[in-house]
Curated annotation (Swiss-Prot):
This is Glutamyl-tRNA reductase. Possesses an unusual extended V-shaped dimeric structure with each monomer consisting of three distinct domains arranged along a curved 'spinal' alpha-helix. The N-terminal catalytic domain specifically recognizes the glutamate moiety of the substrate. The second domain is the NADPH-binding domain, and the third C-terminal domain is responsible for dimerization. GO terms for biological process: protoporphyrinogen IX biosynthetic process from glutamate. Pathway: Porphyrin-containing compound metabolism; protoporphyrin-IX biosynthesis; 5-aminolevulinate from L-glutamyl-tRNA(Glu): step 1/2. Belongs to the glutamyl-tRNA reductase family. It catalyses: (S)-4-amino-5-oxopentanoate + tRNA(Glu) + NADP(+) = L-glutamyl-tRNA(Glu) + NADPH + H(+). The keyword Membrane does not apply. HAMAP family: Glu_tRNA_reductase. Homodimer. GO terms for molecular function: glutamyl-tRNA reductase activity; NADP binding. The record marks H99 as: Important for activity. Pfam families: GlutR_dimer, GlutR_N, Shikimate_DH. Substrate binds at T49, C50, N51, R52, S109, E114, T115, Q116, Q120.
Length: 449
C-alpha cells in the first residue's frame, strides 16, 4: 500500500471553495463509503477543520490514488477536476508522513503552534476507525503523528505563549488574577474577536460572562452560545460596578467608556477593575488609567506581547522541525523493515511447531513426572528456542535496512523451508498484528513469549 494525501487549506483556496470541500461528522459515513468503493483504495482518514480539509488514503498505486481522491473531491464539492488541481496540494509516500507530522505539531497551521489541530487529528483518526474506514498502515501513521504532536509541544512549549490578540488578552487576565474561576467578565461587542475571547475565557473557567452589544438580540444570541448573560448596551456602567474584568472590542468610531462616567460608578468598589481594550479605534478612554484601582491595557501593549511571542514560536518551530525529522527517520526505519515481518512470523511458527512436537515426545518418554519437573523441561525448551531465534531475527531486521535486505530474507526462507503467506515485500503494509498473534500464549506447557 502507498500513502497519498490530497488537501486544501487557507493558503491554497478561498473560504467559498473550502466550505464546499468540508465534511461534517454526519457526512463521513457516506464519504468513506464513496472512497472505499474504488478498488485501489484500501483505507482512508479525512481531516476536516475550519481552515483545512485533507483526505488521506492507502492506495495500491500512487498515481491511481491521486486520481481517485481528486475525482472523489470534485464529485463531492461539485467542482471540476481542473479546479481541484488548482486549489489542492498533494503529498505521497514519506512526504505525506512528514506533512501529517507537521500538521499534528501545529507547524502548518494559520496560527503557528496552535493546540487545537492535534485534537482534530486525533478525532479524525478515531472517527475513521469507528467507521472501519482506516487500515493498518493509516492506524500506525496517525497514532505516530499524535505522539509526535504531543512530543513537540512537551519538549518545545511552542503552544505556551499566545500569538493571537484575543488569547493574549485572556492570558493577561489570568496573570492578573491567577485563576478566573471566581471572576466575572464583561465583554463589550459580539463580533468574531469577542467570540474568540469568550471561548478562551470559558476554557480557563471564568465564573460568568456578561455581554453587551448595541444589538440586544445579537447579545442574547452570543450569551446563549457561551452560557452567559446579555445586558442592554445602556446598562454598561451599572455592570462595571460589579465585574472584575472588562474586554472591549466593538466597531464603534468613538469611545464607549469614559473616565467621568466610570468614576461615578466605581467609587464603592473594594477590588481592582481590569480593562483590556482590543478595539481599533479604541473603545475605552485612555484617561481611565489614572483612576485609582483601575488598570487599563490597550491593543498596542498586547500586540507587543504577541509579536515577541510569535518570534519565540518561530525559534521553537525550528526545534520542532528537528523532532519531526527524527521521528520521520524512525517511521521510515520501521516501515523499511516491515517486509521481513511475515518471514519472522513464519520462522517463529515453524520453530514453535518443532518445539511442541519434540516436547510431546520427551514428556511422553519421561512418563509420570511432577508438574514442577514438567515446567522445568518446558522452560528449558522455551529458552533454547528464543536464544536460537534471537540473533537471526535481529540480524534480519538490520539487513532489511540495506539494499540486500530482500536477498537475506529469501535466503532465510530457503534455509528453513519457510512457507510465508501473503508476503508482499515492497508493499506499504503493517502486519504487526500477525507478529503479536504469533507471540501470544502457547497452549502447551503454559509458556508465553
Amino acid at each position: 500500500m502507498y500513502l497519498v494525501v490530497v488537501g486544501v487549506n487557507h493558503r491554497t483556496a478561498p473560504v467559498e471553495v473550502r466550505e464546499k470541500l468540508s465534511f461534517s461528522d454526519h457526512q463521513l459515513k457516506d464519504a468513506f463509503s464513496a472512497l472505499l468503493s474504488y478498488p485501489s483504495i484500501d483505507g482512508s482518514v479525512i481531516l476536516s477543520t475550519c481552515n483545512r480539509t485533507e483526505v488521506y488514503v492507502a492506495s495500491l498505486d500512487v498515481d491511481t490514488g491521486l486520481k481517485v481522491v481528486r475525482e472523489f473531491l470534485a464529485n463531492w464539492a461539485g467542482l471540476s477536476l481542473s479546479d481541484i488541481k488548482n486549489y489542492t496540494y498533494n503529498y505521497t509516500l514519506y512526504d505525506a508522513v512528514h506533512h501529517l507530522f507537521r500538521v499534528a505539531s501545529g507547524l502548518d497551521s494559520m496560527i503557528l503552534g496552535e493546540t487545537q489541530i492535534l485534537g482534530q487529528v486525533r478525532d479524525a483518526f478515531l472517527k475513521a476507525s469507528s467507521l472501519k474506514a482506516s487500515n493498518k498502515i493509516l492506524n500506525t501513521l496517525f497514532q505516530h503523528a499524535i505522539t509526535v504532536g504531543k512530543k513537540v509541544r512537551t519538549e518545545t512549549g511552542i503552544d505556551k505563549n499566545p500569538v493571537s490578540i484575543s488569547y493574549a488578552a485572556v492570558q493577561l487576565a489570568c496573570s492578573f488574577f491567577g485563576s478566573l474561576k471566581d471572576k466575572k467578565a464583561l465583554l463589550i461587542g459580539a463580533g468574531k474577536m469577542s467570540s474568540l475571547t469568550a471561548k478562551h475565557l470559558s476554557y480557563y473557567g471564568i465564573k460568568e460572562i456578561i455581554v453587551a452589544n448595541r444589538s440586544f438580540e445579537k447579545a442574547e444570541q452570543f450569551a446563549r452560545e457561551f452560557n452567559g448573560i446579555a445586558v442592554p448596551f445602556a446598562k454598561i456602567y451599572d455592570i462595571l460596578a460589579e465585574v472584575d474584568l472588562v474586554i472591549s472590542c466593538t466597531g464603534a468610531p468613538h469611545l464607549i467608556i469614559h473616565k467621568e462616567q466610570l468614576e461615578l460608578v466605581i467609587g464603592n468598589r473594594q477590588h481592582p477593575l481590569y480593562l483590556i481594550d482590543i478595539a481599533v479605534p479604541r473603545d475605552i478612554d485612555p484617561e481611565i488609567a489614572k483612576l485609582p484601582n483601575v488598570f487599563l491595557y490597550d491593543i498596542d501593549k498586547l500586540q507587543n506581547v504577541v509579536t515577541k511571542n510569535l518570534e519565540e514560536r518561530k525559534k521553537l518551530a525550528e526545534m520542532a522541525e528537528n523532532i519531526i525529522e527524527t521521528e520521520l527517520k524512525a517511521f521510515i526505519e520501521w516501515h523499511s523493515t516491515q517486509f521481513v515481518v511475515p518471514t519472522i512470523v513464519a520462522l517463529k511458527k515453524k520453530a514453535e511447531e518443532i518445539k511442541q512436537k519434540e516436547l510431546t515426545k520427551a514428556l511422553n518418554k519421561l512418563g509420570n513426572i511432577s508438574e514442577r519437573e514438567k515446567n522445568i523441561v518446558c522452560a528449558l525448551a522455551h529458552t533454547i528456542l528464543n536464544q536460537l531465534l534471537h540473533t537471526p531475527i535481529v540480524k534480519l531486521k538490520q539487513y532489511a535496512l540495506t539494499p540486500q535486505g530482500h536477498l537475506y530474507t529469501e535466503i532465510l526462507q530457503n534455509l528453513f523451508d519457510l512457507q510465508v503467506e501473503g508476503e508482499r515485500p515492497k508493499n506499504f503494509t503493517h502486519p504487526r498484528e500477525e507478529m503479536e498473534e504469533s507471540d501470544e500464549k502457547r497452549s502447551y506447557c503454559g509458556e508465553s513469549r
